[in-house]
């Protein structure tokens, strides 16, 4: 068993994990987000749904961030090589290419990582174990096996860019959504979690 899976197997919540911000600096412990509702997505700047999903992520963070939502984006190049920029190039790609028009994410973006295979970030290994399939499409799989570039391949692998994981204020993953489920349509589920009470830091 690889180290990422060992760490994931021992974890009880996302608070056991950390990730380095895209802008650089020290790793951010997800434990610092205790009490917040988290929406975690693997993102890519050259995907067919980049404009839709990035703008919807911004919209959810803008509207629901003050009430306790934190959106987290993890660039990943494992799906069709659609995040082939270097870490330091991603923000400019978003600003000038796609979505373009001066777009700037208002949510946390982290350094590129893998979400599947032996090199998967421990956070994603944990999320995949906790939520083995998207709730809206339990049969979601990679549509073209020729595009699989990682090993081992597991049934709970993320199938493409912009899969979403909703995590409650206790750090426990609650629901997984496929790439086809629009980010903005998660709002009712987020609202339900936020209405359960104020977030506590």
Swiss-Prot record:
Its EC number is 1.11.1.9, 1.11.1.12. It comes from the Eukaryota. The modification N6-acetyllysine is found at residues 86, 112, 146. InterPro entries: Glutathione_peroxidase, GPX_AS, GPX_CS, Thioredoxin-like_sf. The modification Phosphoserine is found at residues 32, 195, 199. Keywords: Acetylation, Cytoplasm, Lipid metabolism, Mitochondrion, Oxidoreductase, Peroxidase, Phosphoprotein, Selenocysteine. GO terms for cellular component: cytosol; mitochondrion. It is found in: Cytoplasm; Mitochondrion. During periods of oxidative stress, Sec-47 may react with a superoxide radical, irreversibly lose hydroselenide and be converted to dehydroalanine. GO terms for molecular function: glutathione peroxidase activity; phospholipid-hydroperoxide glutathione peroxidase activity. It is an enzyme of class 1 (oxidoreductase). The record marks 47 as: Subject to oxidation and hydroselenide loss to dehydroalanine. GO terms for biological process: arachidonate metabolic process; glutathione metabolic process; hydrogen peroxide catabolic process; lipoxygenase pathway; response to hydrogen peroxide; response to selenium ion. The active site is at 47. It catalyses: 2 glutathione + H2O2 = glutathione disulfide + 2 H2O; a hydroperoxy polyunsaturated fatty acid + 2 glutathione = a hydroxy polyunsaturated fatty acid + glutathione disulfide + H2O; tert-butyl hydroperoxide + 2 glutathione = tert-butanol + glutathione disulfide + H2O; cumene hydroperoxide + 2 glutathione = 2-phenylpropan-2-ol + glutathione disulfide + H2O. The modification N6-succinyllysine is found at residues 86, 112, 146. Its main location: cytoplasm. Homotetramer. Interacts with MIEN1. Catalyzes the reduction of hydroperoxides in a glutathione-dependent manner thus regulating cellular redox homeostasis. Can reduce small soluble hydroperoxides such as H2O2, cumene hydroperoxide and tert-butyl hydroperoxide, as well as several fatty acid-derived hydroperoxides. In platelets catalyzes the reduction of 12-hydroperoxyeicosatetraenoic acid, the primary product of the arachidonate 12-lipoxygenase pathway. Belongs to the glutathione peroxidase family. PANTHER family: GLUTATHIONE PEROXIDASE, GLUTATHIONE PEROXIDASE 1. This is Glutathione peroxidase 1. It comes from Pongo pygmaeus.
């Amino acid at each position: 068993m690889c180290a990422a899976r060992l760490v994931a197997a021992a974890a009880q919540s996302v608070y056991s994990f950390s990730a380095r911000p895209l802008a650089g600096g020290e790793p951010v412990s997800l434990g610092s987000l205790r009490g917040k509702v988290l929406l975690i997505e693997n993102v890519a700047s050259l995907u067919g749904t980049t404009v839709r999903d990035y703008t919807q992520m911004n919209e959810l963070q803008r509207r629901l961030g003050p009430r306790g939502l934190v959106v987290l984006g993890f660039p990943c190049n494992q799906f069709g090589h659609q995040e082939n920029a270097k870490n330091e190039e991603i923000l400019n790609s978003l600003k000038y290419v796609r979505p373009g028009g001066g777009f700037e994410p208002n949510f946390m973006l982290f350094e590129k990582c893998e979400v599947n295979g032996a090199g998967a970030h421990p956070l994603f290994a944990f999320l995949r174990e906790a939520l083995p399939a998207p709730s809206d499409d339990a049969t979601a799989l990679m549509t073209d096996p020729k595009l699989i570039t990682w090993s081992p391949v597991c049934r709970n692998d993320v199938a493409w860019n912009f899969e979403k994981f909703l995590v409650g204020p206790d750090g426990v993953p609650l629901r997984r959504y496929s790439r086809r489920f629009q980010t903005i349509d998660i709002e009712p589920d987020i609202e339900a979690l936020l209405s359960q009470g104020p977030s506590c830091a």
